[in-house]
Amino acid sequence: MPLARIDLVQGKSPEYRRMIGDVVYEAVVSELKAPEGDRFQVITEHPAGDLIADPRYLGINRTADVVFIQVMMNVGRTLEQKKAFYKKIADGLHERLELRREDVLINLVEVGKENWSFGNGIAQYA
């Protein structure tokens, strides 16, 4: 059910990109309680300068290595689940890839269940 869009500066290895996807998927399952195998991700690299994130917004010091993670999902997660999700991703990317926690920007987009079709032109959750 969640669809993750991950945007980062180009030049990272396929293994690096895959690891970002793995960390996001694991957090989706463990913190948002999505079922195993519910992995839908689009990972896109951009030329330097095409990802713009204020380097000091909200007092967080970001670098040009910022990663944007946007997850579209069904409505219904608690604030506690969302906070745990953010932390799990930031910590996981830092531990596995040495990506600075400050460079991980996450956005959740909640939609109604009727807004999904996983194939065959059918709204499977409606």
Residue ranges and their predicted role:
Residues 1-126:
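Interaction-mediating elements
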